[in-house]
């Protein structure tokens, strides 16, 4: 079992936060009948200044999990519960992955901020003609290659894995794609990144550059987890924008404030 929590704000005394954490953990273990040694705990703290998320451990232990595909098959993924802040699979995005697969047959697909390429796997299993995955991290792209292999997807030129700054790559790329998926981080100050990335500040140039690579009849799926995010009016005025949040959030993530927001963006 993976038990995730967010670090309490400074206004909460540490003793109170610890007590609440232990009560919640005990309650979940009791309800699911899980032994303590079967529990993996991850705590996410607010990132600030020049702080960066580092690798947490070096167990190298991966588990195989699966989820339904658009054609009622199974997509298989490697997850790691101990070595990284995240596991390699974002459960809250499973509906978006399925939508991408449903719209990928015979098409060219571009996955930006691809992470471990789970959306790319769904696109490939959905019959995409070609899938390009771009991420700053070679490590995560290698993980993505393993996910492709796990699903029996051949290592061919039709599946590309590109480790590069997304802004730099998309500025120099001249290809057009039928389906584009962008799920950027809220904030990044990676040493490999040129400057910093802030999704609220930088989403307009990011989407505009991506739309330059979108085929005339194509669709760009844009999603992000910044709860206070507001899509700039420039995007709504320039393109046809369809809100998708209510369609893509599963019942187990259906809380008062959506855990993320998503849109389908097309040329007018």
Label each residue range with its predicted role:
Residues 116-129:
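Conserved SAM-binding loop of SAM-dependent methyltransferases across substrates and taxa
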């Amino acid at each position: 079992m993976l038990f995730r929590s967010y670090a309490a704000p400074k206004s909460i005394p540490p003793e109170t936060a610890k007590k609440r954490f232990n009560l919640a953990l005990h309650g979940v273990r009791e309800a699911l009948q899980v032994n303590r040694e079967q529990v993996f705990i991850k705590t996410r703290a607010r990132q600030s200044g020049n702080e960066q998320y580092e690798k947490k451990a070096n167990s190298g232990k991966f588990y195989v999990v699966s989820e339904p595909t658009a054609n009622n098959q199974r997509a298989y993924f490697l997850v790691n519960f101990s070595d990284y802040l995240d596991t390699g699979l974002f459960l809250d995005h499973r509906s978006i992955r399925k939508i991408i697969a449903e719209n990928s047959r015979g098409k060219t697909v571009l996955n930006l901020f691809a992470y471990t390429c789970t959306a790319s796997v769904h696109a490939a299993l959905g019959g995409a003609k070609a899938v390009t995955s771009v991420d700053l991290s070679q490590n995560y792209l290698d993980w993505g290659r393993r996910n492709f292999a796990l699903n029996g997807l051949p290592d061919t030129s039709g599946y590309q894995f590109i480790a590069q700054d997304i802004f730099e790559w998309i500025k120099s790329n001249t290809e057009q794609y039928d389906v584009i998926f962008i799920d950027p981080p809220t904030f990044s100050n990676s040493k490999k990144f040129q400057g910093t990335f802030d999704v609220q500040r930088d989403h307009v140039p990011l989407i505009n550059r991506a739309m330059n690579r979108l085929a005339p009849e194509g669709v760009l799926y844009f999603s992000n987890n910044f709860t206070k995010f507001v899509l700039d009016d420039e995007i709504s005025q320039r393109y046809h924008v369809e809100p998708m949040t209510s369609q893509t959030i599963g019942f187990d993530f259906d809380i008062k404030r959506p855990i993320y927001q998503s849109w389908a963006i097309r040329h007018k």
